Each structure stands twice: as C-alpha cells, then as structure tokens.
A protein has these predicted regions:
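PTP/DSP superfamily signal
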Residues: 77, 82-92, 99, 109-145
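Mobile, glycine- and charge-enriched loop segments
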Residues: 1-19, 25, 61, 140
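Glycine-rich nucleophile elbow surrounding the catalytic serine of serine-hydrolase chemistry
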Residues: 101-105
Length: 145
C-alpha cells in the first residue's frame, strides 16, 4: 500500500509526496497510476536505491533525478523541479526524497506560486515538518524571486 511508504502524503489526485520508497513500492506506485517519479534526494541519502532510475523505468514510469543538497537548496534546484512538474502536467506525479522534507518544502513553494492559498499549502507542509532555518530561508527566498 502507498500509505506504507515513509511520510506518504497525497496532495491531489495528480500529485503525491513521500520519503524514499523501496524497489517493491515503486511497483505499487506504478500500479496506482503514477507515470512520473521526481527524486530530490542525493544518491547518498538514507535508504537511497543505487539503481533507482532502472527500477522506476522498468515499471514504465518517467524518472527525473534532481539531487538537492540538504544543507544548500538552491533556486536552480527549484527551477528544475518546477520544469519537471510542468513537463508532466497532464500526468500523475510521485515526488520523493529521503524523508519527504525536501519535497514538502518544494511542493509548498510550487503550490504557493500557483495560487494555492498559503494556509492550505502550509497545512500540508506541517503534516511532514516545520522547516528549519536553512529551509525557511530557502522558502522565503524562492517566494520573493
């Protein structure tokens, strides 16, 4: 079940976020109708799958690796993320990192920039974590760009 994936959080019918899935869970993700996977974790992150691209593509899904350094998230990282989501606009997208912390921050910013009320986007972010100073500064910087 998708709910068994660490910090799984569906945002809409077309977008879900989570921590690192196992190889087996990528099969469940595909069976649930997801066609695109965006990975914001580093290859060295906790529980990272060394062959994740192959695992995802073997399930018939498109794979976008966008490794985001936990200590130094950048506007360029966010722009790549937004471009990947735009490329998959008509698809069901599963976005993950190690613990759904990077992802929840990126999705919060993305939703705010697309007109979702901040209170609604913040409620989903709070289900995962309260961003630390590094990440709150990143969020604030991207929102004013």
């Amino acid at each position: 079940m998708l709910t068994d994936i660490h910090s799984y959080l569906p945002i809409s019918a077309q977008l879900a976020t989570a921590g690192q899935p196992t190889a087996e869970q990528f099969g469940e993700i595909a069976q649930a109708g997801f066609t695109t996977v965006i990975n914001l974790a580093l290859p060295t992150s906790t529980n990272a799958l060394p062959d994740e691209r192959a695992v995802v593509e073997a399930q018939g899904m498109t794979y976008y690796p966008i490794p985001v350094d936990w200590e130094y998230p950048t506007l360029r990282d966010f722009q790549q993320f937004a471009s990947a989501l735009a490329a998959a606009a008509d698809q069901k997208v599963f976005v993950h990192c190690a613990l759904n912390m990077r992802v929840s921050a990126f999705v919060y910013v993305y939703r705010c920039l697309r007109g979702v009320p901040r209170e609604a986007a913040a409620a989903d972010l709070a289900k995962i974590w309260q961003p630390n100073e590094t990440w709150q500064n990143f969020i604030n910087a991207v929102l004013v760009e």
